[in-house]
Amino acid sequence: MSSLPLLPATVIGSWSFPGWYARFCEDATRQPELFGADDREEAVRDAVRLAIEDQLRAGADLITDGEMQRVDFNLGFYDYLEGLRPLPQARRWGPPAHDQRSRYLCVAPLAAPRGLGLVEEYRRVRTLTAAPLKVPVPGPFTLAGCLQGGDVYRDRLEITEALLPLVNREMKTLVLEGVTFLQLDEPSFACRPDRPEEFLDLIARTVEGVSAFISLHMCFGNFRARAVGHRSYRPLFPHLARAAVQQLALEFASREMAEIELAREIRPPMGLAAGLVDLKNTWIEPPDLVAERLRTVLKYIDAERVHVTPDCGFSQTARFIATKKLAAMVEGVRLVRQQLTS
């Protein structure tokens, strides 16, 4: 991470789909016969290229591929898993909510003989940019949230145990490909904070043997810009500060910086990626406000251990808003960085 400046500005993972690409994804799902393999790859590459350009134009120091090949941040991975049967959607009408996401039934032991698709994503984005990259990886507990055990697994924890080695193997393969920064996405733990010691054990085994800088992202849900849990990290501390990762990526902006004092409990060498832009709000934060929020963060943790991010990924945000929010965030960071280094 030595190549990054003080207070690196970055995204969490996903970028907003361009309108044309969102339409392509819908059509490719409904009428797959309309597109060949080359057509699909061309569309994905063009979308990734735009995601890269948007992030770099805004001034981000560390970027992703925008998760352009994924559905939300984790739903696309079920296509790589064997042993699942899709379940019918119980509610199709009315206001969108988490119950309208895809659901699957486990009908055989879970396996991923082709991996989870992350290596292909990384190889593609590496051909398109030499910029510093991080790769978000869905955590096994969060992946288990859309699965029912059926006659194969007793409960969500057993499903998690089955997914854990698949995620671990994918992370190790990414490291062999040259990835140095991995982000483990486990928002479900923030929404179910009642078993913190069990959570720490699952995290430790998920990242065991993975030789990379690992960030642990825990928001409170952002499907259709809605949270899905009680928005407090307090039940997870001080346990969370002992997680077997190098950084915690946490949501603060949407909560008006509530609980930022918990950053005091994050001891070196662990760092904090502080969410300072609210993606549940279409209002564009002025750079001065981002700078003010960042100065608040620095009251509790030293600048050398801080990255600055939005609260969550941009997949649920219109692209024209996402570009403005990221640019404002970067400018707010620049103001504080200039103040600290002048």
What are these regions (language model features)?
Residues 1-342:
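Domain-level signal for soluble alpha/beta catalytic cores
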